[in-house]
Amino acid sequence: MKKIELHLHFDGSLSIPYASRLMGRDVTSELVSVHAKSLAEYLDKFTLPVRLLQSREDIETFASLLAKDLESDEVIYAEVRFCPLLHTGVLTADEVIEAALAGFRRVPEVKINLILCMMRNFSIEENKEVIRLAKKYRNQHVVAID
């Protein structure tokens, strides 16, 4: 059955096997929270994926793997959300977005658009940067901000 995925977190989609391969060890406990006692504890599980997805190659490769997973699940359209500013350890926010889009383009059978996320703990200027990026890429597969 063909499907549409409208709420998918890029960082939260990093698979345990892929993350473990990147880290060279089992990272299950760092990615899975069976009994999170608070939102902060739950969100802490995003720390490792964000840390692992800092290079153009890693972002692009993971984006293509995510697209392939969606395709195998018969998803024909997806809106993937993430905050590009979280991935700017060595890249610019533009490079982060372009890497994700390049990875998604490797699987043209799934139409994937981005929702750029602002963060509650970011400054007004940082969140304005997310808005600027959304405007810049609005005709290039960025469909919303959150």
Regions inferred by a protein language model and the residue ranges of each:
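Metal-cofactor-binding active-site regions of metalloenzymes
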Residues: M1-D146
